[in-house]
Amino acid sequence: MSHIYLLSPSSAVRDKAALRRGVKRLEAAGHQVEVDANALNRDTRFAGTDAERLAAIKRAAASGADTVMTTRGGYGLSRLLPALPYKAIAKSIDKGTHWVGFSDFTAFSLAVMAKTQRVTWAGPAVVEDFGALDGVDEITNLCFDDLMTHMSEGTGWRIGKDDPTAFSAQGLTLWGGNLSMITSMVGTPYLPPVTRGALFIEDVAEAPYRIERMLTQLLYAGILANQKVIFLGAFNRFNATPQDRGYGLKVVIAWLRAHTKARIITGLPFGHVPTKVLLPVGQTVDVVATRREVLVLWPHDHTHAHHH
């Protein structure tokens, strides 16, 4: 049985019923769920004032939980980066706590990686994933179980028909998350200086031209040149416009392939979609691609991140 600590470090929880469902499902799976005292706080759009949300992170770090999870993403962690209790977070990770989240949580993961060289996990949130009306996605659930039982040692998926095949790369640093969040951190001390990277990206409600514009920033900032592999997750919930005239994600991906030596692999099951694999942000990984699928493999003990 795992001890899960639940907090709201970003936007306020609107769907309380989904939160209750998520907690019930986690409990039904045999976990002991501890909900932070401020989890349902609201201050304008945020889940409490900056001070309240920081206090929740400090409590989570001191909880001794096996896993710290967020209720939801949204916006709010960017405000807290200078004040995060990095030492306490690093200590909790060294003692075996997994910090898990996605979307706005990207800011937390990358800042912790930059400041402490520790591994956190890109993965599900309680409201969106465990509280979903039609049940928890099977793959998301299996990956989460693997993490809970310390069995997590890699992930794999079917790659796109235009993706590069039959290659392998060892000792890459896996990192990434939400593209808008990554881009917002360029030029700050909270973006880790990764070389020999395996970068994964996803985004939601961003038109293809906006995704391309963010990628140009990563390109011109010299970040793409340091990646050996770039994994593309889901880019969804946007509306095409008549002026696009056939310009879409396929064109963006073709542009990306033409402007970076990194191998671009599509189809990563991650993003604002039901199926989410769990990815250790900051972990050293091996990447192996066959004709049809790609495998990302990491060691069992995932407490320390590495900057190469």
Which ranges hold each PLM region?
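Short internal beta-strands
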Residues: 35-36, 101, 227-234, 265-267
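Short glycine-rich anion-binding loops that position phosphate/pyrophosphate groups of nucleotides
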Residues: 72-75, 206, 236, 270
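Conserved anion/nucleotide-ligand pocket segment
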Residues: 117-181, 187
